[in-house]
């Protein structure tokens, strides 16, 4: 294998993986925003096919051989290429430990869970969602045992979201925060309460949407690449690359501040993602480096 050709194959592989991620992400986004209520099973069927193809591409012999070759020649790669290879090998090793049928079933489960959660929230019926939530917990615990049997499942997933983080580190950090935050909260609660009547009233959705658009422009978001939709619980997602960011909010007629802060928070996520270098689009280096950094950016703007 010629190194220059292998590097080109590396970029092609990542573009294909990004395309599958784009399609699967769009299914999730559609389900959480505008999809009709009765279409979850339809999306789940499509998700199962896409996730199976994604699994096969990720763990296939050609992919493994390519990355093993590049890893053996990593001294000849630049820093970005080395990181791409490292992250892809890490993903492959984890995915190889999870049976394909279980991986595909889990992707279908998430589509089902999102649909059930929306129905349960509308009626405040946790019992409706509880069985599906238990399945999600059970699956994640099982996957953690597959990938890192020597670790506590929670430590495994913590490290997946924030590389190297452990429960012990979190306990120590939160204990330090508690020492300072609890006295501060008590001090604040002892102060005269502010009159927040101005935040409550009747605020039409059209007016709140106009405020959302104003906030997004003021934050510097490129509205040609960042879209806004309504959903039950606000979130931000990248579709394919940082060139397509979708943020969502939830309007409450009697409390405009709820959506206002949601848009600022989610806008912070989108602003961070869109700051990625264009040369990294459609690679595993595109977007945020970790969940912790991502939340620090969204909270920075919201706070």
Segments (PLM) and residue ranges:
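A well-structured
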Residues: 1-163
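Post-HExxH zinc-binding segment in Zn-dependent metallohydrolases
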Residues: 287-303
